[in-house]
Structure formats: structure tokens, C-alpha cells
Amino acid sequence: MQKYVDYGIDALDAYTNKSIGVSNASGPKSMSASVGDLLRQAVTDQMDGFLARHQDYFKGIVENGREISLEFKRFDGFEYYFNDDVEFKGREMEFSSLIRRYIGSIAKNKNFSFNPGENNIDVSQIKIEMEIEEEDLFEEGKFDMVPNDAKKFADKISRFIKKQFGYPSKVSTIGLGKARITVGSK
């Protein structure tokens, strides 16, 4: 009786949980090979294409930025809603519009999905630089390139909100590629 192996491999981006490479195939048929040998041969036959998809995905991240998502919430005790007007540089606009513009000014791309509401804002498909420059706290005048992630990006937005309006906010992570900014205090 001939034996063969069907298999499926799916590689996921740890930041977005999106599939970046899939390989489904059947291995060669054999009367005498062990299951381990059949599996090894089946995977080896498809590995070059699978790894090429990984490399293309990584090149895309380097060129276009790493994808993250943000979630904005407001504490119930916070006196403002995200669709309330605020003044910024002599202009009145909804707080959510200002957030959208600020994200666009610091993201690698300005093409992201923005879904505002009065109590929450969901932002997805934001592209950020893979690395950012950060001051070395132990060596004066020295800066290092460090990995960037959703929390560091959200921290920057949180500091902007506090500096411009005095609104406190709390940043929490939801995995590597997603962060929540809760505005106001309890």
C-alpha cells in the first residue's frame, strides 16, 4: 500500500495575526518510506516558495512600514466625547479629527482605516517605521535605533494629547501590534 502525506503550513505575522505565507500540498507517494521521511520530503519540495513569500513580506515591511492597530476609549468620568469640538492652533475641530490628523502626521503612511465614535475610535492598517531613534539614558548625547511597536507609537499620541490639552491618558498593549489609549481619568 502506498503512503503519502498531506500537509498545510500557515505563517502568521505576530503583530497583525495576518497570514503571510501558506503552503498546502501532498508529498510524494512511497511504499517503503516512513511518515517522517514522507513529511520531510513534502515540506522540502515546497520550502523555497514558502520562504520566498516570507522574504517578500519582510521586504514590504522594511519599505512600507510595519502594520499596527490602535483603539481609543474614554473613561466614563471623562467630561468630553471624541466627537466634541476642541481648539487646536486657532481652529475648531472634532477631537477625533485631530487624532486622525496627528496619526497621519507621524505614521509612515497616511492611508489607514479610521472609525470614530463618541466613546471610542478604532484605527487599523497604520504603517509605522520598524525602528525609531531613542536617547540612551546612560550615555549623554548618544542615541540608539530601537525596535518600534504599537505601544511606543501609542505613547507618542498619549504625550501629544496630554501636552496639547492636559487630558490624562493610559496606554495598554493588546499584543505586539495593537495598543489601547484610554483618555481621561476614572
How would you label these PLM feature ranges?
Residues 1-10, 17, 158, 166-168, ...:
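A short, hydrophobic beta-strand-centered structural micro-motif
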Residues 11-13, 72-74, 130, 183-185:
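Flexible glycine-/small-residue-rich
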Residues 1-2, 11, 24-29:
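Short N-terminal edge-element motif at the start of the domain
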Residues 18-110, 149-159, 175, 183:
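C-terminal/domain-edge helix-coil "capping" segments
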Residues 2-7, 63-67, 121-123, 176:
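Extracytoplasmic
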Residues 106-173, 184:
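C-terminal soluble interaction/assembly domains
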